[in-house]
């Protein structure tokens, strides 16, 4: 529903601009007309944690200089690299009244209707991915783990619990969005994503 939130924010700004005399009623009408200006809903899933000092060290060992992350005054971590997982999902509502580039040619990009975008988000957030983190992450912290992957890779009981949350509790009740297979999504979590200690 991020498209709806973005639209609401933009319309609020245009109303304030109108009050301040920066734009006229025609501009507000134009931006408000969903047949002309769209705010497509999206679902994205790609883990991109803060820059890893280990990856920075690995890159420097390969001869790449000045890779160490920097912490800004606002406690934001930045680096000249991005450590991210290979799997990525970007589901975009195909609502572009003025045309669009062939976004679906991108790796992991899916064009869909609004209901499918919403189902994809619900699959990820309420059943397949987030519940596993919510159920096991806090216990991992109590048990002294710093990394989710390390916890699952070394603690049989935590892996068993994570698999139960996803396979036994989640998959039987998930609404299939049709463009992403919930079974394949969960299999990928346990075979590729969760074991990745670089994340």
Predicted regions and their residues:
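Substrate/ligand-engaging "lid" and interaction regions
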Residues: 2-199
């Amino acid at each position: 529903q991020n498209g709806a939130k973005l639209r609401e924010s933009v319309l609020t700004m245009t109303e304030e601009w109108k009050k301040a005399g920066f734009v006229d009623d025609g501009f507000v009408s134009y931006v408000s007309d969903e047949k002309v200006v769209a705010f497509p809903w999206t679902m994205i899933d790609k883990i991109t944690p803060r820059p890893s000092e280990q990856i920075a060290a690995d890159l420097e060992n390969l001869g790449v200089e000045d890779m160490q992350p920097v912490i800004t005054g606002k406690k934001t971590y930045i680096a000249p690299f991005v450590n991210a997982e290979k799997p990525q999902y970007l589901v975009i509502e195909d609502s572009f009244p003025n045309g669009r580039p062939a976004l679906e040619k991108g790796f992991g990009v899916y064009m869909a209707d609004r209901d499918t975008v919403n189902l994809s988000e619900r699959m990820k957030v309420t059943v397949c991915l987030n519940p596993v983190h919510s159920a096991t992450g806090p216990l991992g912290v109590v048990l002294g783990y710093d990394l989710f992957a390390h916890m699952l890779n070394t603690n049989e009981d935590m892996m068993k619990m994570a698999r139960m949350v996803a396979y036994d509790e989640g998959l039987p009740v998930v609404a299939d969005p049709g463009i992403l297979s919930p079974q394949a999504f969960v299999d990928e979590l346990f075979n590729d994503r969760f074991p990745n200690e670089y994340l």
